[in-house]
Amino acid sequence: MALERIAPGRELPHAPGWYGRAILINLVQVAITFATNHLWLDLLSGVSLFHLARLENAVMQGFIGWFVGTFVFYWWHRVRHLPGFWVVFHQVHHSPARIEALTAFYKHPVEILTDSALAAIIMYPLLGSSLEGALWFNFFAAAGELFYHANIRTPHWVTYFIQTPELHSVHHQLDVHHYNYADLPLWDRLFGTYRDADTFAARCGFPRNNERQLGRMLLFHDVYKD
């Protein structure tokens, strides 16, 4: 976030009330994350398909889990763009005109909770991770989301390894909201949803000032074309 202030990637539009909305939703994200860490461990640990905890190295557990998670979440991300799923889970995240680090976790609480549960299913009953490994998974996933939502410029070669802010601006582009779903562009390239970009999309978010209708979005009203 400091780098965004020192060397911003582009000038972001003025969005009345944005910081208040963003801080509120980000606090909800933090609260849900902390509240569910031990809950998922209690509910989902025990029997697992694999036994990642045997590695003992929690960082490696988290990294392997994150890599597997990028594939699972690629498909879950595509599902969230389907009619019905979009309104319930994902339109809040796509509504802001400003794509910056604060936007990374600007999500409907239902989406936050569902993402948290899916990550826990990957780490516990699927991979058999320890709690420490799951926390590292969260770290890698959060770092990735903060990076590719950040308002910073990146060299094009980075796109061969990880999603960049330029690539992800296409995903949030006004009247597009498609392409570049994955943390790893590998999955988008393999499944035909990759769109290359070395500059930022001109406009992102919802038309007019519809992003300000946060209350209606939280109540599952589709506000995109209002």
Give residue spans per PLM region:
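Juxtamembrane helix-capping/reentrant segments at transmembrane boundaries
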Residues: 10-32, 95-107
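Hydrophobic alpha-helical membrane-embedded segments
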Residues: 1-2, 34, 65-78, 144, ...
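Core segments of transmembrane alpha-helices
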Residues: 29-37, 109-123
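Membrane-embedded alpha-helical segments that form the functional core of polytopic membrane enzymes
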Residues: 52-78, 134-135
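Cytosolic/stromal cytosol-facing helical appendages immediately following the last transmembrane segment
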Residues: 3, 86, 95-106, 127-130, ...
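Active-site His/Glu-centered metal-binding helix of metallohydrolases
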Residues: 6, 72-75, 79-83, 92, ...
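Membrane-helix interface linkers and caps
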Residues: 1-22, 37-54, 199-203
